[in-house]
Amino acid sequence: MRTLWMALCVLARLWPGALAGCADAGRCCPGRDPACFASGWRQDRVYGTCFCDQACRLTGDCCFDYARACPARPCIVGEWSPWSGCASQCRPTARVRRRAVQQEPQNGGEPCPALEERAGCLEYATPQGEDCGHAFVPAFITTSAFNKERTRQAASPHWTTSTEDAGYCMEFKTESLTHHCALENRPLTRWMQYLREGYTVCVDCQPPAMNSVSLRCSGDGLDSDGNQTLHWQAIGNPRCQGTWKKVRRVEQCSCPAVHSFIFI
């Protein structure tokens, strides 16, 4: 039987008209389509009605040439667009970036990945250019990885070269947090999963989160004696929030990457 099957395959290559299949019928159909069939040899070596729809891989009744006539093609997407600006000024909100589909998946090819990503952000200037955003009492934080992309002078025209590097690091010991942090699994908010009660975390204060006059970050707890309970909130999911207490101020953060954050 195997010899017969190999002979049929060779015959199909040398004399395509000898065997009907998906190519001869001009059929390649997505999903399950009972009307997408031809007459010829099937891949299970049975002659008769064979199918050229995507579901035939599961049912085992594909035409012998399905893989060649209907190759799987993966979804292809373009590059990410630049990040948008914050949706609004002077309060925690979100920015977004998108990418477009250049080729839809075909014949069971790899499906398209996410076409949109959102990340938390906070604008520190009104449309009129007035300073804002520093009046928030809680400390708004995000992962320190975001600091690599943040443009330090974007929010305020008052920054000078001498104040650009006036940053500092605050160490806190987390006291409590909501269960919503552990539920985050989106690519840009997955860092919230690593927030834990009782751990010491580092939060970097750098422009533009740093006020250009006071050289302080809102919610830094610098005036706390260490016994005061302070509040924090994760940018990107307002339900991920909690409390911590100040440990100390240091010049450079030295916490592990998963416990390193920045003020926003």
From Swiss-Prot:
Organism of origin: Bos taurus (Bovine)
Disulphide-bridged cysteine pairs: C28-C36, C28-C52, C36-C70, C50-C52, C50-C63, C56-C62, C63-C70
Subcellular location: Secreted, Extracellular space, Extracellular matrix
The keyword Signal is annotated on this UniProt entry: yes
Keywords tagged on the record: Disulfide bond, Extracellular matrix, Glycoprotein, Secreted, Signal
Protein name as catalogued: Somatomedin-B and thrombospondin type-1 domain-containing protein
Record-stated family: Belongs to the thrombospondin family.
Keyword Signal: yes
Xref: Pfam families: SBSPON_C, TSP1_spondin
GO terms for cellular component: extracellular region
Domain SMB: 24-75
Residue intervals of the TSP type-1 domain: 74-127
Signal peptide: 1-20
Glycosylation sites: N227
InterPro entries for the chain: SBSPO, SBSPON_C, Somatomedin_B-like_dom_sf, Somatomedin_B_dom, TSP1_rpt, TSP1_rpt_sf, TSP1_spondin_dom
